[in-house]
Design a protein with these regions (language model features):
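Non-catalytic cap/lid and distal C-terminal segments of serine-dependent acyl enzymes
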Residues: 1-184
Length: 184
């Protein structure tokens, strides 16, 4: 059995970007993001998790806690499993918005304690990866492919298990994320 909890983000202005970005960003295609994602994950582990545990029978072990998300949520899932690894043992990161804060992610994956029992699933679709011209074959060279593969390699170097999946013909949309999550 599994309990799945969906978290609604703010919809006014740039609230979603601020809530789902764990690092402050100034520039690039996002413009400015305040980066309160760390507060969001802290709220999940310190408050939301407790509410769920009071209402439902749960296992309190990190091995029973996973986090998943797509796009900015994929970035948050990766951040959570790295920075809050004492709470989360697994993460599904679908079409993660990684590009604008990659140096911060690399820093965290190199410096945060990561349990060897950590499993991370990274996915994307060929139709969302810039530079891919043949959408009938797996993408092995786009920027999106390279950054997901490099994060997987960093995680593996730290003893974690990392799986990557490129959905041939996949787009940056919920219908394709529904297909990608099946590999998790």
């Amino acid at each position: 059995n599994m309990i799945i909890v969906g978290i609604e983000c703010g919809h006014e202005g740039e609230e979603r970007l601020n809530e789902y970005c764990p690092y402050s960003v100034n520039g690039g295609f996002l413009g400015h993001a305040k980066g309160v994602g760390n507060d969001t994950v802290r709220w999940v582990v310190e408050e939301l998790k407790e509410v769920i545990a009071r209402e439902y029978r749960t296992y309190p072990f990190r091995e029973c806690m996973a986090v998943a998300g797509s796009s900015m949520g994929g970035l948050m899932a990766l951040f959570a499993v790295i920075r809050y690894n004492q709470w989360f043992s697994k993460a599904a990161c679908l079409s993660s918005a990684l590009g604008f804060c990659l140096p911060s992610i690399y820093h965290d994956v190199r410096s945060c304690p990561i349990d060897p029992d950590t499993r991370v699933y990274l996915s994307w679709g060929t139709r969302e990866a810039r530079g891919v011209t043949d959408h009938t074959r797996e993408d092995k060279s786009s920027y999106m492919s390279r950054r997901n593969r490099s994060i997987a390699n960093y995680l593996r170097a730290r003893g974690a298990t990392a799986q990557i999946f490129c959905q041939v013909g996949g787009q940056h949309c919920e219908a394709d994320w529904g297909k990608q999550i099946q590999g998790f």
